Each structure stands twice: as C-alpha cells, then as structure tokens.
Amino acid sequence: MEGSNRTVAAVILDLLAKEGVEKAFGIPGVHNLGFWNALSKERPEIVSVRHEQSCVYAADGLSRATGKLAVAITTTGPGAANTLGAFGEAAISGSHVLLISSEAPIKNRSTQGARGILHEMDDQSALFSPLAKRVTIDNEELVLAKSCRSADEAIATVVDFLKCLSVAPVGAGYIGVPADVLNQEFVGQIPQPSDRVMAFLGKLENEIIDLNPVMRLLTESKKIGIWAGGGATSVSSEIAELSNHFSAPIFTSFAGRGIGSASKNYLSIPIHEAEAENLLSECEILLIFGSQLDGMNTKNWSIKFPKKLVLFDANPRVALRNISADVVIESSKLAMIISELLKLEGRDQWADAAKISTETRKRVSLSDKGKAGMTLVSAIEKSWPIENNIVCDMAISGYWTGVYLHTNRPRQIAYPVGWGTLGFGLPASLGPSSTGLATLLVCGDGGIAFGLGELATVAQEQLPLTILLHDDGGYGMLRFDQQVMHHPERGVNLFNPNWKVLAQSFGIEFVDSDLNKLPEVLAKRSVSSAPAIVLITESLYPPKSTSPRWSEE
C-alpha cells in the first residue's frame, strides 16, 4: 500500500494497522466517511456502534483487556463532543486510547472563527486538551490533543502521537482532521517521528536511575510490603518474584488487581477491609509501583500507611499530591528496577497473606451485609474461566466483583473507578468481546440504561457477551447513599423495561436466574459464542470499598 494512491484517511488506517490495531470503533458521519471508503482487508475493521460515547468506551475496554493501543473514530462537532465522558474515563484511568475525528472542512472556514459550517466549532481539540496525555519535551509541554489543518500535518501528528502514546505513563490522545483533508490524496512520504519526539524517546531510553537510596532503606527494613497499581500491569511476574524474595505482602489498587497474583503473598482482599489495612500498617516500608494512590483506593488517604514509602512511577507527580515519599524513582523501567532489588538479601516470612485473605473472605461471606455479595463473587470465581474477560459497571454488583473477585492475572477485570463513570459497562464490554473471547459484563439496571442502544451492536456483531444484569429498581448505590445520609429517596427509584421482552426484541438470549443458580448458568455461558442477558434481582448490600462504609469498624 505504501506506493499506491491513498487518501489521508487511508494512510491513517495504514499507520494504525502497522501499530497493531486490528479493530477500531466508530460511527460514520458525512464528514468522516473517508475512513469507511478506505476500508480493506489490510486495514483495521471499524465496528459500528450506536452512540459516539460508546466508540471510546469500547476502545477503552479493548485497551484495558489487551494493554495495546485501541482506536475510536467519530465525526465533527456533536459527534466528537459526545465522546467526552468516555474520553475522560480512558484518560483518567490511563488507557492506551486514540480518538480520531473529522473536523469542519478547511476550505470553507473563516480565519476569524466559526461561521456556521455544519458541525463547526472554533477549536474542537480544546474539548479534549484538559484530559489528554501530556509529555514534557525540553521543558515544554506537548498536549496530545491537536486539530490539524493539512494532510502533511495530519500524518506527521499521527506518527508523533503513536510514539508518544506508546510510552508510560499511558493516556489518551485526540487528533482532529478536516473533512476535506481526509479525502485528499496523500502524495508525500510518510515522515519519521519529529526530532523533538525522537529526542524525548531517546532521553527516556538513556535515563540514569540511582537506586542507592532505595537499597539503603531496604537494607534497614525487615517487614517489606508492595503496593501495585495499574502502571505495573506489565511486570506482574516480576512483582510476584520480588514479593517471594522479600516475603512481602502484595496490596493492589483497583486497576492493579491480579498483579503479582502468582505469589503466595498476594492479598485477594481490598485495603478497605480491616485485616488488609492492619497488615499494611505493620509494614516497615512500602514499595509502590505505578499507582497514584487516589482517594477511592485509600479511603481518601485515611489508611494507615507505613512510615517509609518508596515510589516507582513514570509520572510520580500525581501520587506525590497524595503522599510524602522517602524516595521517588521517576522511571517506567520497572522490570529493570526489580531485577536490581532482587540482588538484595531475601527476607524471612513475617505474614501469611493467603491465610489473611481466606479468613477475611470467610468473615465477609458469613456476615449479613456481605453474604449475598460474596455469593455473587463466588459464583463468578467458580464458573468464569481465568482467560476470559470481565467488565464491571458502577453498580453494587460491579463493586463486589471488581474489588473482591480473586483476580488471577492483570487485565482480567475492567473496572471504571478511575473517573467513576456510570454507564461504562455495556459499551466498554464491546471492546474485549469483539476479539471473540467470551466476556462477562457485570452491571446494574441504572447503568445499562445509559447505553441500551448498544444491544443492537451486540446483536449485529453476535458478540460472545454475557450481560449479568442486577435489577434493584434503579440507582441502588445512590439509594443507599441517601439512606445513610438520612436523605429522602428521590430520583433513584426508576421504571425498567421487561428485560425478557427487550432481549427478545434484539434476538438475544434471556435467562432469569438467581444467586444459587448462577454458577451453573455462567459456566454454560462461558463457552457460548452468542450473546445473552442473565437477570438477577436479589438484594445486595454495598461492600466496604464503597465510601458510605469507609467509617465502619
């Protein structure tokens, strides 16, 4: 394809294919049809969704499942603006996502500002700039959100952004291309990354890391703990090895679930349970890998941190707003760092993380507040294969699953407590299920209502998606918030459709289940290549990871 006549849209698709992108998600519009016109077997397939927000959610879900770049394509003005909630979730959660949108045709624009071209606005990229990934090059900040004006600028921007998005810390980017430019023939050579970007990448590659301060602190410490966040998903086996070497319990953030799970020291309970927090407080030093230590993961920073903290992160500035670290190592080379730490003398076992996890889970399972939630968790653990994906929405059922499920590998669960985006679940599940791997969506009736149109996408694509739908009559978590705060229940009790009739109208299988039948139902669904909705209606009490319960003893 390099030597043939290609439009700008075709060249962009070829660059994405070269980057390993096999599927993108989008909606065609009058301005972005150039992408659909350029489709071919050698270029990424574009899966058509039913709402622009969904195309970014789907890309986000795919990126979380694979760790690779995922792409969304939308159209000018309202089409691009519709993606903002999903773009924010991807950006805040550190997903490797690129949104490409058409913009108003350049030939019709006025130099004085918007003049009323269909879908036109003054600066479309400005919608995304506050959320987009930033990199600092020679003390200047490059924001990965740009509106291009020419074919050469568009292609050069794609080349540069693909490079910048590929390095940690991961984030989301936006590129806008005028509609008439997308359809222009590209006659130039594909450029190399700009000198600025190459210098930036070279600096990262050749960075010098001084681990001596870390080594000194570790030499003085016997009880070592490890905290793994979403920025450490690529070093799961290395963290497990380090944990075994230091006999260090592994605490994980929501995004870090499954990291180091091969270690006997992996905790399968959240820090929000007293047993986990007490163990954390017993550590003399905590090694923090790739975590921002945000409010939801730390009960708004009220947990009992050890006295000594060491932070390893490609961008430690956010975490340093939340903690004071004794040593900060700004680097993405976590595997190399861990290999150096392994040269230190090992430590004797001082805590039984497996026993603590087992006993805590048993205690929660036997409690009035936790019995139903842990029954749900157990059903999924028993019946949903490790290699299959799970996507959770902001729902009580999702909170139990995303936090308490014994996660056996990184990226097994996509959980939207980055930005906390209700309605994430259904459109995000389109991403991993589009690869052909059976995917479980755990959601509530309130969240799924945000994207019911995507049931048409599920049906049309015949995605291997099981929608485990918990119907509690509306916004169950918000209802609980109102009850705890002694507020009247207003705006939370909602009318729902007949789920069976709804499923049938889309040609989707429907199963009316309950928690006792769920293991058998999910086991059958885990090997099915067709979509289904599985309904449960039992009452679920929110888990201790939810903020209204943080103050409980």
Which residues does each PLM region occupy?
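Glycine-rich, acidic loop regions that bind phosphate or pyrophosphate groups
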Residues: S101-I155, F254-A354, I467, Q482, ...
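Phosphate/pyrophosphate-binding active-site segments
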Residues: M1-S4, V135-D152, G176, Q189-I190, ...
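Thiamine diphosphate
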Residues: V30-I106, N108-D122, L280, I285-D294, L320-N322, Y399-E553
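Glycine-rich, anion-gripping cofactor-binding loops and their flanking helix/strand elements
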Residues: R64, A228-A314, V318, N408-A438, ...
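Glycine-rich phosphate/diphosphate-binding loops that line cofactor/substrate pockets in enzymes
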Residues: V11-V21, G61-G67, L162-P169, D210-I224, ...
